[in-house]
């Protein structure tokens, strides 16, 4: 069961943020299956994070009341589809972290809104629908995921 989220551009930081639908303008803490997630000052993921796949490898901003930076996230399902093949999303996001020209913010916002969130809401959480950290925000990881070669493999 997925929470309803919306993408909002934060012009001050030039990032897209995920916010719960109906949240206050400053956002609100995200709740997990074990209750509210830790505060931004927390330095580690809860010890029982293994029971909930989506808590693995979350950046510090995931626990912020302003919400996580959406540019860090995509789903395994979308990585496998031909819809994403021509956009090569991981490379696009990596280029943005380097300050290089890439997909526009408007296009990225549409991608997350129309593709990813639709999948999450319709299909719910499953093992194949894991969250991968791809880059695009400068927040330090709370817990590093297993190494991946998204940026070097095509």
Swiss-Prot record:
Gene Ontology CC terms, in alphabetical order: host cell mitochondrion; host cell nucleus
UniProt KW Nuclease keyword: no
Post-translational events: A fraction may be phosphorylated in insect cells and HepG2 cells, a human hepatoblastoma cell line. Phosphorylated in vitro by host protein kinase C or mitogen-activated protein kinase. N-acetylated in insect cells.
Keywords: Activation of host NF-kappa-B by virus, Activator, Apoptosis, Host cytoplasm, Host G2/M cell cycle arrest by virus, Host mitochondrion, Host nucleus, Host-virus interaction, Modulation of host cell cycle by virus, Transcription, Transcription regulation
GO biological process: DNA-templated transcription; symbiont-mediated activation of host NF-kappaB cascade; symbiont-mediated arrest of host cell cycle during G2/M transition; viral genome replication
Cell location: Host cytoplasm; Host nucleus; Host mitochondrion
Superkingdom of the organism of origin: Viruses
Region (Mitochondrial targeting sequence): 68-117
InterPro entries: Transactivation_prot_X (IPR000236)
Subunit structure comment from the entry: May form homodimer. May interact with host CEBPA, CFLAR, CREB1, DDB1, E4F1, HBXIP, HSPD1/HSP60, NFKBIA, POLR2E and SMAD4. Interacts with host SMC5-SMC6 complex and induces its degradation. Interacts with host TRPC4AP; leading to prevent ubiquitination of TRPC4AP. Interacts with host PLSCR1; this interaction promotes ubiquitination and degradation of HBx and impairs HBx-mediated cell proliferation.
Family: Belongs to the orthohepadnavirus protein X family.
Protein function: Multifunctional protein that plays a role in silencing host antiviral defenses and promoting viral transcription. Does not seem to be essential for HBV infection. May be directly involved in development of cirrhosis and liver cancer (hepatocellular carcinoma). Most of cytosolic activities involve modulation of cytosolic calcium. The effect on apoptosis is controversial depending on the cell types in which the studies have been conducted. May induce apoptosis by localizing in mitochondria and causing loss of mitochondrial membrane potential.
HAMAP family from the UniProt entry: HBV_X
Protein name: Protein X
Species of origin: Hepatitis B virus genotype C subtype ar (isolate Japan/S-207/1988) (HBV-C)
